[in-house]
Structures are given as structure tokens and as C-alpha cells.
């Protein structure tokens, strides 16, 4: 298993992958969490679908003064200079990351990504499903589901 990686999670405001409204980042070194970062982000396009608000609880008022992904990149870019990226349902998070980088005209070589959902299906047998909250319950990991930092932490710990 990987011992050094960055676990990520994004929450979006609507169906567009560039509509990031929250990011959670957890740095794992030698199998231990060494750093955590989370931030609200002003989504592009700037509108919220009620269905998405109901899922994560983030409202337009909460992000109206937040930085854009582009403006935040100067702070978060270093977290992506890592051996690997880990996420639960990594296909979603990686597509969001790539779309946001492209929209911001940022050309970044990303490391290999690993999906804890896919890994768990291979390694953990007998669960009713492989949703993040189910896995966290199984492993005794506290999770505030659909809060980006908590989801990144859960994905990082489920990787162990």
C-alpha cells in the first residue's frame, strides 16, 4: 500500500465539474496524516442547485466572498506535487480537478491517482456497499459525510 500520498475531496455546487465550492486535502506521510487543509471556493459557474445544497449544506452566502479555484491555486498547488492522489470515487474528484485546472489555464502534471472505492471492493469483502460512509463505519472512522475535509480524511484512512 502507498505510505505517502495526498487524499482529496471536492464538493460541487451543481452538475458542472468546475463548480467546486469546497476542497478538502489530507497529506499522508509514512502512513500518518501530517497535514490537513480545507477551504470554501467560489464556484464557476456561480449558481447552486438545491439538490447539491441538500447534500453538502454549502450555500451561495457561504462562498460569496471565497476565492476562485484559480486564486486558491497559489496556496493549494503544492499539495498536488506528491507521489499519488487518493480519493473515494477518484474518477469524480480527478475530473473535477482537471476541469478546474483547465478552466483556470493552469497546466499541471498530476500524479497517479488511486480510488479507495475500487480498492475497497477488491480488499474488503462482505459489505452491503462500498460508499465512503459504509467503509468508515466498518473501520471505525468518524465521518461527517459530504464535508470535504472529512471525506478526504476518510478516504485517506480507508486507504491504510
What are these model-derived regions, one by one?
Residues 1-110, 125-146:
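Conserved non-catalytic scaffold segment of RNase H-like nuclease domains
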Residues 72, 120, 155:
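Short Asp/Glu-rich motifs
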Residues 107-120:
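Conserved beta-strand -> loop -> alpha-helix junction used to position metal-binding or nucleic-acid-contacting
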Residues 148-160:
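Acidic, divalent-metal-coordinating active-site segment for phosphoryl/phosphodiester hydrolysis
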Amino acid at each position: 500500500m502507498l505510505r505517502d500520498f495526498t487524499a482529496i475531496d471536492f464538493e460541487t455546487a451543481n452538475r458542472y465539474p468546475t463548480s467546486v465550492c469546497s476542497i478538502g486535502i489530507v497529506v499522508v506521510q509514512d502512513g500518518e496524516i501530517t497535514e490537513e487543509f480545507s477551504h470554501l471556493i467560489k464556484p464557476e459557474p456561480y449558481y447552486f442547485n438545491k439538490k447539491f445544497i441538500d447534500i453538502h449544506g454549502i450555500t451561495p452566502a457561504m462562498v460569496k466572498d471565497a476565492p476562485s479555484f484559480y486564486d486558491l491555486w497559489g496556496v493549494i498547488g503544492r499539495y498536488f506535487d506528491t507521489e499519488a492522489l487518493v480519493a473515494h470515487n477518484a474518477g469524480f474528484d480527478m475530473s473535477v480537478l482537471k476541469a478546474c485546472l483547465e478552466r483556470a489555464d493552469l497546466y499541471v502534471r498530476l500524479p497517479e491517482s488511486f480510488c479507495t472505492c475500487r480498492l475497497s471492493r477488491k480488499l474488503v469483502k462482505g459489505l452491503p456497499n462500498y460508499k465512503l460512509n459504509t467503509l468508515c463505519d466498518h473501520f471505525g472512522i468518524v465521518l461527517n459525510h459530504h464535508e470535504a475535509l472529512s471525506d478526504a480524511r476518510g478516504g485517506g484512512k480507508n486507504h491504510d
